[in-house]
């Protein structure tokens, strides 16, 4: 039986807990090093080193996703701990469900430091039936139906964690007023990220 770690909120022995402190409140995630080892190592190392401290969510699209992790706040910046872009780590166990922590990229194998949190609350009915026909696992199709998400990003963006606490903070960020390029008018700031291993 395949394990879909996003379908439960308990932190397993092989998962890492992180708490993201923002000026809108806290969000707690569990990360999946078994599924996306390089991606998790990149995020955890950046978090511990303070790379994300003071960095904003520079792109916020309500009912889609909130994106951050770029020190330049332009959407063009951010580097990985590996010195260059690194490869995607797609899995048939992790999906872009509501609350998924996923890597932003500029095409295949272009991961740096930018990430997004999926915030789409409803998957259209016709898309759900396409997922079932398209080979998505039944428990995941059901989760998309119940929780929402962005299934068209599956196998295009590396999912490496899941929001387990702080949904109201995610919603607050998503509902912030934005201007040009979907950039918040008032900065939404990541103050720090605590890693609890």
From Swiss-Prot:
InterPro entries: Cyclophilin-like_dom_sf (IPR029000), Cyclophilin-type_PPIase (IPR024936), Cyclophilin-type_PPIase_CS (IPR020892), Cyclophilin-type_PPIase_dom (IPR002130), Cyclophilin_A-like (IPR044666)
Annotated PPIase cyclophilin-type domain residues: 14-195
Physiological role: PPIases accelerate the folding of proteins. It catalyzes the cis-trans isomerization of proline imidic peptide bonds in oligopeptides.
Protein family (similarity comment): Belongs to the cyclophilin-type PPIase family.
Record keywords, A-Z: Isomerase, Rotamase
E.C. number(s) listed in UniProt: 5.2.1.8
Name assigned to this protein: Putative peptidyl-prolyl cis-trans isomerase
């Amino acid at each position: 039986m395949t394990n879909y770690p996003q379908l439960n909120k308990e932190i397993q022995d092989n998962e890492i807990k992180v708490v993201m402190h923002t000026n809108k409140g806290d969000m707690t995630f569990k990360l999946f090093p078994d599924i996306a080892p390089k991606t998790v190592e990149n995020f955890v190392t950046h978090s511990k080193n303070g790379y994300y401290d003071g960095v904003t969510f520079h792109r916020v699209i309500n009912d889609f996703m909130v994106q951050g992790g770029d020190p330049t706040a332009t959407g063009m910046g951010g580097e990985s701990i590996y010195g260059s872009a690194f490869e995607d780590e797609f899995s048939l166990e992790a999906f872009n469900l509501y609350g998924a922590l996923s890597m932003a990229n500029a095409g295949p194998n272009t991961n740096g430091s930018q990430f997004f949190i999926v915030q789409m609350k409803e998957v259209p009915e016709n898309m759900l039936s396409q997922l079932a026909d398209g080979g998505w696992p039944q428990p995941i199709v059901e989760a998309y139906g119940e929780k929402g998400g962005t299934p068209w990003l599956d196998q295009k963006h590396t999912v490496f964690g899941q929001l387990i606490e702080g949904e109201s903070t995610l919603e607050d960020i998503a509902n912030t007023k934005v201007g040009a390029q979907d950039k918040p008018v008032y900065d939404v700031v990541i103050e720090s990220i605590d890693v609890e291993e």
